[in-house]
Amino acid sequence: MSARYAEIGVTTNFSFLEGGSHPQDYVHEASRLGLDAIGIADRNTLAGVVRAFSEFDNEELIHKPKLLIGTRLCFADGTPDLLAYPTDRAAYGRLCRLLSAGKLRAGKGECHLTFADLEAFIHERSPSIHELATVIHPPSASINQPSASIHQFPTPSWPGLTRPSTPTSKVVLVSVDARVKPGHDGGKRVADNSQILLVVMPSYRFQTKTIAIALERLTALNADAVWLGLTPYYRGDDKRRLARLRRIAAVARVPCIATNDVLYHHPRRRALQDVLTCVREKTSIDKAGRRLEGNAERHLKPAAEMARLFRHDPEAIAETLRFADRISFTLDELKYHYPDEPVPPGKTAQAHLQDLTEQGIKQYFPNGISDRLRATIAKELAIIERRGYAHYFLTVHDIVRYARSQDILCQGRGSAANSAVCYVLGITCVDPTEIDLLFERFVSEERDEPPDIDVDFEHSRREEVMQYIYRRYGRHRAAIVATVIHYRPRSAIRDVGKALGLSEDVTAALADTVWGSWGKGLNEMQVRQAGLDPHNPMIGRAVELATELIGFPRHLSQHVGGYVLTQDRLDSYVPIGNAAMADRTFIEWDKDDIDAVKMMKVDVLALGMLTCIRKGFHLIAQHKGVRFQLSDIKSEDDNAVYKMLQRGESIGVFQVESRAQMNMLPRLKPRCFYDLVIEVAIVRPGPIQGDMVHPYLRRRNGQEPVVYPSPSGEAGDKNELRQILGKTLGVPLFQEQAMRIAIEAAHFTPDEANQLRRAMATFRNVGTIGKFEAKMIGNLVKRGYDATFAKNCFEQIKGFGSYGFPESHAASFAKLVYVSAWMKCEHPDAFCCALLNSQPMGFYAPAQIVGDARSNGVEVRPVDVSFSEGQCTLEERCGRHHAVRLGFRMIDGFRWADPDEERVQLEAGEPPSDDWAARIVAARARGAFTSLEQFARITALPKRALILLADADAFRSLGLDRRAALWAVRRLPDDVPLPLFEAASAREQEDERAAPLPAMPMAEHVVADYQTVRLSLKGHPMEFLRALFAAERVVTCREVSRSEQRASGCWLRCAGVVLVRQRPGSANGVIFMTIEDETGIANIVVWPAVMEKYRKEVMGARLVLVEGKVQASAEGVVHLVAERLIDRSAEMGRLAEGLVRPALPDGADLYEPLTSEKYNYEALNGDRRDTPDAPAQRHRHPRDVRILPPSRDFH
């Protein structure tokens, strides 16, 4: 009879920086080895169990071992580690609550458990997150629960253990309804067969007394559900060590159970596990010593091998099978219940939803609706009722209603835009019947999946909405979904380099050759470009291990806004922990995990453009007297807005401001709203990889006939794709079209199509879409479709898997494209001001936003203490438009309070921040400033704030330019308050003889502007280098696009400041750069071969000289195709010749300009003459001073 064995001690890489293999790796290896069962037991977490659970759906698994769901409990009070496995659903709920209790008293990513916690949760109900309506409060925080009782969690008391580094925390317990919910253990003692099975895991150097006491306490607590784990460590003393453990178990009368205490699925992962240990222990391989495993034996082993190792104790092997047989729980048993929304008395949720829908119809269609829309709404409501989703729609409606009541802009997007019900409820802004969107894409009776509604809110005010959800549902029923932060190329290279002992400059050089966040590793060319030898054994090993590490989970973080809401307590489904941000809690599972266990989430997302639009609307109302809402801006075909977009004038416009979109606009020439839908979707990996863009443009421009692919002969209806592809001229551009082609033309079953859709959604991370390729292409070709069309369709599907837009999503975004373009066209002053006040967002830095506004006739005025406020503002009209006044927020390092953030802080009871800008505005309201001394006296700003203002040239209205203001600030006393009645007349110091200061050259002014406010209204840095570059026959960006040069396709040299670098995944390695000089911008194309040759210049240059050939499209879009790139960033230092500055108070990273006068270091830094041993002032050469802000890089 062949040996049988169940491995119960598997540590995956969700025991972060410990396990050396993915959960999926273990499932496949256990299947290959023919194990009876495999138990996932990560350190104080259940984060990886769903990955293993989901992998059992993989058709490649021939043998499917039983999956045991558990965790490894690690304690803070000296209790030995325990493997914990729940036998049923009730026991699983208690285990989740135990983990939640430990996590909620600790900081993010930590779990502080004691044996007392185990005693409380193993059988009996205990205070859990159901009662924890408010989570951790530091001792200094105010707790707005006057009637709550405060409980201090116990602190460690065993010898030699230090107090945790986090401050003592208080958890507020408030009265919450804790009635037993159906299917849960509630508060009664559980039945004997509902147990958490516990396995004591002795360390290598265990203490006999410690293990004996633990077994005694556990058996008293858990009767027949305790085991002692036996693990061979292969260090020569296993026989003696395991014999000691058997004697301890015999005395305690508990069975022994075998486990290899697995750290990786295969021996080849041992080296990577050593690296992870070094990262965790913050050491290197040569210093780690015994913290590393002594061999490569901690891997999954076949039953025969484990039987051989335990040949003197076969019962320990047999016990693994008995242990596995006692566990019946699977994740299939998690029966999710969506929260019941309050409804009016006598109404059901469905009836209430129908009432709200009717109210929405009257609001949005006061003159009545079409029969078609009425029929669509009735159909949707019927499906919602049959699927039981009314409560979900009511939840989202309630959240949107709250946001609108607080004047927070929001808009639903994604598949929800397919729903007419969502439209009349005010959740989405696009009428799906106008562009023929498909409700079944959102909710289908054929798919047993919950709907998923994504709602965007203003990014500056989303926190208000999130806190409303916590208040509305309680923290016992609401938490944010997790996001798994994975190792990416740069972080993998850095951590592996440190672990292997490579110097910081070597790891930095390797990391700096990586573009963006995604990639598979380093190639030989990149290693050479880092100045290293790829054949060096240590370098080669580092690259190999870093490549293995890419994709490993590094830690958990909170999702950008996905909430899980439950009817009963959430911590009975999944453990909950604290986020790094105050007042945030999140679960351990990510969006794919909760999809796998069929839990519903509500996405509360942040969108910067909504903030910009709301602020723009406010400025228009304030200064022009006209009030707008999103729904008021109607798209009118072929108006001035579309004409602006046709010219490619889209800087700042949502979704169409990238280089690729700006080039597409003149080619597509949008004339109506649906053209914008296509514009948003067409510059995406799906249509590009599927080679669908050029055919669509040619057909749109009448350059080729519109034809619809069709099957041959008797294979099917010749027009079966006409209805699917009619709106896009026979060319599939949207995700829905590709899916419908799979069903209608490739004859995929609904289940296969659903699997394909899921594969598309996870392609970028998982890459499982390839298994559908042969079927889809084969079926299409078999039915007579052209093979090229079939291949292109599937390439398009793979592109959508990388990053593609469904039609409904594109339609939602197209609405914001039009609104932002309308504001840019009709109100460029308000648009510029709102964009600046909404930073950071978008493709372009403030310098380009301001430059674009000025080119459109908007006057922009500098920061000035007599006129500016914290935010940028509009001033009196200057010509057609109001002038934009830059605000104090533009000054790097200057303290100003965002009113949106202040509102959240006040609601949370936090003290207001020190707002220097508000001090200036308040002082100015009492009278005009007359001098710098008076300004300093009545604002009482610290010396550092005055230096920042002077360096930003903000005292011009007081008759002081930058140099004079800096000199005057130097003469002021340090931050020592003067007596009340002496302050008005006190002189800061003895008058100095007035010394005329040399005028600051304009080039230095521009440099200082960029250093302080990130832009200059005085000029462009390239203006002052023009003579230098002209002597080298370098042309301007404007000259690159001159008509005679476009026609000739000539060779040119052009130089400029790098604004944006892009490497789209659909461009096959091509880099697109946008550079700027004083005349405008130029688009640069860098082919992969050139990129590899000039990687350092492409990735690192702030100012670059490009040599290449002009390439122009028929629509007049011009590119310079690079053949050679030269980093000329050092030329910026020429503008700052003589600009060497000492350090300033409070660590300000600013430097005073040199003058003919001697610096008074004592005035700035205190008298240092009596401290000869004090370190010398650190100076920085001008070429090391940051002059230009970094480019904005996208991939």
UniProtKB/Swiss-Prot annotation:
GO molecular function: 3'-5' exonuclease activity; DNA-directed DNA polymerase activity; nucleic acid binding
Any Gene Ontology biological process: DNA replication
Record protein name field: Error-prone DNA polymerase
Keywords: Cytoplasm, DNA damage, DNA repair, DNA replication, DNA-directed DNA polymerase, Nucleotidyltransferase, Transferase
Compartment(s): Cytoplasm
NCBIfam families: polc, PRK05672.1
UniProt keyword annotation of Chloroplast present: no
Gene label: dnaE2
Disordered: annotated segments: 1163-1195
GO CC terms in record: cytoplasm
Reactions listed under catalytic activity: DNA(n) + a 2'-deoxyribonucleoside 5'-triphosphate = DNA(n+1) + diphosphate
EC class name: transferase
EC number assigned by the record: 2.7.7.7
Taxonomic source organism: Rhodopseudomonas palustris (strain ATCC BAA-98 / CGA009)
Phylogenetic classification of the source organism: Bacteria, Pseudomonadati, Pseudomonadota, Alphaproteobacteria, Hyphomicrobiales
Purpose of the protein: DNA polymerase involved in damage-induced mutagenesis and translesion synthesis (TLS). It is not the major replicative DNA polymerase.
Top-level taxon of the source organism: Bacteria
Family the UniProt entry places it in: Belongs to the DNA polymerase type-C family. DnaE2 subfamily.
